[in-house]
Amino acid sequence: MIDQLTASFQRSEKLQKHVRFLYSKGSLYKVFNGNLLFHGCVPMTEDGQLLTFTLGGKARSGKEFFDFADTAARQAYYHKPGSPERQQGMDFLWFLWAGRNSPIFGRNRMTTFERRLIKDESAWTEPKNAYYTYYQDPAVCDDLLKEFGLEGPHCHIINGHIPVKSKKGESPIKGGGKLLVIDGGFCKAYQQTTGIAGYTLIYNSACYRLVSHEPFVGRAEAIRTSQDIASTSVVFERLESRLKIAGTDVG
């Protein structure tokens, strides 16, 4: 059965096209126009320091760890099938998916089976990395930005992964405006938790704008009431002067 599942994944034209796109265009993080974008977290210790991993015979943390992880993930795809490098990359991909202190997963454990098989909700907890506590501190956000070569009043960390519980009053703006959590809240499964359908970040030459979306009411109701997806837009940061092409990374 495992062989059949493997063959189905390997022979799926659409899936393989998508994977090729991710590897050719994607990366574990991106620095762009003064912003640091990544999905999960920069792993930290409980006392607020960058978590150190010993990999390839060397201690690595922060940006150096991210660069190593990005290279290892590519080994899993580009190296020759059956080679030690490919197997090492595949093992590292498994860690990135659900491993403790993974920069993509950002939790200590995954409790998918517990949620399905155990009624006691205390068994479902997935403790988050300390990063999700410290990212409320503007000084920590500034230190993380410096780690990736960014410094200035309009530099930001743009984060995903963790749904923002808007219905409980949680804001996507963290760290005194230095960090933004833009999670894919359009996913219907999360809307009971968040209370909305996620956020869109709009960035132009004049400002940063956050747009929050209300859940889609359904096709029949939308036609009956002539109602599309309702959105609320808020400008949360303005630039002192318009950003010109010369001030961007790639124009």
Regions found by a protein language model. Name each.
Residues 1-251:
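Feature recognizes metal-dependent phosphohydrolase scaffolds
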